[in-house]
Amino acid sequence: MKLTIHEVARAVDAKNDVTGYADSPLVKAEFDSRLIGPGDLFVPLKGARDGHDFIETAFENGAVVTLSEKEVEGHPYILVDDVLTAFQALAAYYLQKTGVDVFAVTGSNGKTTTKDMLAHLLSTSYKTYKTQGNYNNEIGLPYTVLHMPDDTEKLVLEMGQDHLGDIHLLSELAHPKTAIVTLVGEAHLAFFKDRSEIAKGKLQIADGMGKGALLLAPADPIVEDYLPADQKVVRFGPGAELKITDLIERKDSLTFKANFLEQALDLPVTGKYNATNAMIASY
């Protein structure tokens, strides 16, 4: 992580004067005090327990500075109104500083598989990093950004949603160059009025994208009302711009052709949905 204490303070609009602290380079940012090592920034988030209760432990483990919503005695700290908001602002700043190309993936199903396939394809030509595990929410995404290797060129971010507006926040933070919506299903329907509202939330992935950026979306009538006007939208599915033209399924593998691919692709997995995921990752 190529950041220093003073730089972090500026990025998060610190409420205190940090110029008296050494402008030490930081190794990484952690919100779990048990994972803190020498040279780290501690991010005391509030969850089941208040991370502020573990600030002392974080410094014992090697932290050189902490974000905090209150004054900290005896240790360097960066005072902010809200630690989570500051964490997100720091990640947004870091993406802008590094200039890494961001690829974002969401969907009710298939987003993790598609993320992994896309990252694999990009890694053949670029230094690529991707969301680890299920770190796809308002905490996990900034954590992913701040943990990418210093030489990263392409960053593939998975974006999840439990409530309407979740993906809007993530997109505005990450400003994707390319985004994919794999499928609009009924996952998390308990938190949404209906499938149409799920589609609305998923398509908010375009909210932070620049004019002319590429958005891949399913050829599903449910998404039509929410497609952006300023981005290049390419649909996939039967009868759409991108489609599978031939599919051979075997016991433990498959081969498929798509209308834009010059040759067939072989996959060591089964299921047409995996062929679709691979197709859109390959575009």
Where are these regions (language model features)?
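N-terminal leader/targeting and accessory segments in enzymes
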Residues: 1-89, 270
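Phosphate-binding loop of NTP-binding sites
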Residues: 7-12, 87-214, 219, 223-232, ...
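Thr-Gly-centered strand-to-loop micro-motif
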Residues: 31-32, 43-45, 130-132, 157-158, ...
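Residue-level recognition of short, solvent-exposed, well-ordered loop/turn junctions
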Residues: 37-38, 210, 279
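Structural signal for conserved beta-strand scaffold positions within catalytic alpha/beta enzyme cores
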Residues: 44, 68, 79-80, 104, ...
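A generic structural signal for residues located within well-ordered alpha-helices
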Residues: 50, 165, 201, 219, ...
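Short, polar loop motifs at secondary-structure junctions
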Residues: 63-73, 218-223, 238-239
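Adenine nucleotide phosphate-binding catalytic loops in nucleotide-utilizing enzymes
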Residues: 195-196, 232-283
